[in-house]
Amino acid sequence: MVSMSTTGNAHTENVQHRLTVETVEIAPNTTAIRCLDWDRDRFDIEFGLQNGTTYNSYLIRGEQTVLVDTSHQKFRQLYLETLKGLINPKAIDYIIVSHTEPDHSGLVEDVLQLAPRATVLASKIALQFLEGLVHDPFSKRIVKSGDRIDIGKGHEIEFVSAPNLHWPDTIFSYDRKTEVIYTCDAFGMHFCDNRTFDEDLEAIEADFRFYYDCLMGPNARSLLNAMKRMGDLGKIKIIANGHGPLLYHHLDVLTECYQSWSQRQAKSETTVGLFYVADYGYSNLLVQAIGEGIQKTGVAVEMIDLSTAEIQEIQELAGRAAGLIIGMPPTTSVAAQAGISSLLSVVKDKQAVGLFECFGGDDEPVDTIRRKFIDLGVKEAFPAIRIKDVPGASAYQLCTEAGTDLGQLLTRERNIKQIKSLDVNMEKALGRISNGLYIVTTKKGDVSSAMLASWVSQASLQPLGFTIAVAKDRAIDSLMQVGDRFVLNVLEEGNYQELKKQFLKRLHPGADRFAGVRTQTAKNGSPILTDALAYMECEIQSSLECSDHYILYCTVEDGRVSKPDGLTAVRHRKVGNYY
């Protein structure tokens, strides 16, 4: 039985996950309806930091009333009660649907039943999607860049087309009176907090970056175009996003981050095109995971929805990309089938192609598509990813590792050139810095990973802490975020070769890194290597981005030495341009 309690203007639903709704006046005649999901963990790849999330909706009241987006279905009762407490829904004149992803449009049909005379304002593609979601006829109007509506009392709302952020149907909406822009997923973050605005930059910056890397980075070119259009609107006081705190206190800093990160992506020497069908099966989540793995290696990615993109747009990206990732489309999608045919017509034998199933119930057979590419002489980026059940954490790990393998393949020659370009004397001098040999092991849910490490150094006495350098292109990176726990296994001099060999093996994506290795389980759930000299259970406290590595500061929570007289294995190098 679900019980509900009310305090002021916030409702609480006492279920397994804490769900609350808050209303806040953010500007004249403008109310934010923030649905707070305190315990949301990793269901999408972008929830990796596990700090919950919010679903933000907005009410603008002039002489007419506008509702900007709705919320997730899980908030149905709470959201609708809150909305009714703010306004008679029959008074709503317009519902702006920024895009049709279910966490923002999941309650559009419910609101339309309460506000039958409201007109839905959305992009052409969004309205096509909505017609499949809303079962009764509704009033609708297509909006695009430059279109405006005047709702009175000075509130004139101008629209900006922002396709592929991160869905193909996205629009922004700018209120000229309040200078508030409503951006849905863009400039958001998965961070749940009672503070409406971005008061504490340090608290949110890791989540802000993680969210960008997962959702916005794959569409850096589209984001730069959208930001250029934003610049033409005039002054922006508040970015009212769809997830997390609204941007106000640090708006300039955070938008500059988006600008610089996106410019870096757009200037990348190497690009992989990700071709999929939005909102079909698990294509969105799977392609995000593959894209995350690719981006770890410094390779840029660009995403295109095969069902909505123009043929020339598909061919333009395919023609300049070093690699192509293709999610199997439904056999019934004529547009997606045409998109696949257009890819086959421009693909080159020097490109690498990776295929994945979407578990949508009507996938095009992956072997049929695979054979067509092989017959053209195209090499496979990785074995086709076959999804035979609802994908879980292990499936997403498989996708991330496959993406990382492809990125490393595409950057191998570039990295070799960079290594050879270093000053010989300088690299020899740097190589005289020696370190111990360690193996980092970690497990989160059903996903486990490990890596050989040598760049480890004690950093504090109270508390006991050390730093460890983790390359950005390591598969373990997604399990080594601030707040994550792991085990640092110390290898023993004279007794480390077998473990070193095991954890240096290049395995197929998804393979069990611990196969044949004796382990025990630490208190924090991570594997302890039985044959290690010592181990420490650790927690990551902070992270510093340094070019091609992250420097993690970690504290020690527990530890033990198995051989008191043993010595730590040491890695001696002659040059400093590799491990």
Swiss-Prot record:
Keywords: Electron transport, Iron, Metal-binding, Oxidoreductase, Transport
E.C. no: 1.-.-.-
Cofactor(s) required, per the database record: Fe cation
Ranges where the record places region Flavodoxin-reductase-like: 461-579
Cofactor-binding details, from the entry: Binds 2 iron ions per subunit.
Binding site for Fe cation 2: 103, 185, 243
Domain Flavodoxin-like as annotated: residue spans: 272-460
GO molecular function terms listed in the Swiss-Prot or TrEMBL record: FMN binding; metal ion binding; oxidoreductase activity, acting on the CH-NH group of donors, NAD or NADP as acceptor
Classification via PROSITE patterns: FLAVODOXIN_LIKE
Pfam families recorded: Flavin_Reduct, ODP
Presence of keyword Iron: yes
Residue ranges of the region described as Zinc metallo-hydrolase: 50-243
Annotated InterPro entries: Flavin_Rdtase-like_dom, Flavodoxin/NO_synth, Flavoprotein-like_sf, Metallo-B-lactamas, NADH_oxidoreductase_modular, ODP_dom, RibonucZ/Hydroxyglut_hydro, Split_barrel_FMN-bd
Cited CDD domains: flavodiiron_proteins_MBL-fold
Binding site residues for Fe cation 1: 99, 101, 166, 185
UniProt cross-references to SMART domains, sorted A to Z: Flavin_Reduct (SM00903), Lactamase_B (SM00849)
Task performed by this protein: Mediates electron transfer from NADH to oxygen, reducing it to water. This modular protein has 3 redox cofactors, in other organisms the same activity requires 2 or 3 proteins.
Further remark: By homology with NorV in E.coli, could be involved in nitric oxide detoxification.
PANTHER family in UniProt: DIFLAVIN FLAVOPROTEIN A 2-RELATED (PTHR32145:SF11)
Family recorded in the similarity comment: In the N-terminal section; belongs to the zinc metallo-hydrolase group 3 family.
Name of the protein in question: Putative diflavin flavoprotein A 2
Annotated organism of origin: Nostoc sp. (strain PCC 7120 / SAG 25.82 / UTEX 2576)
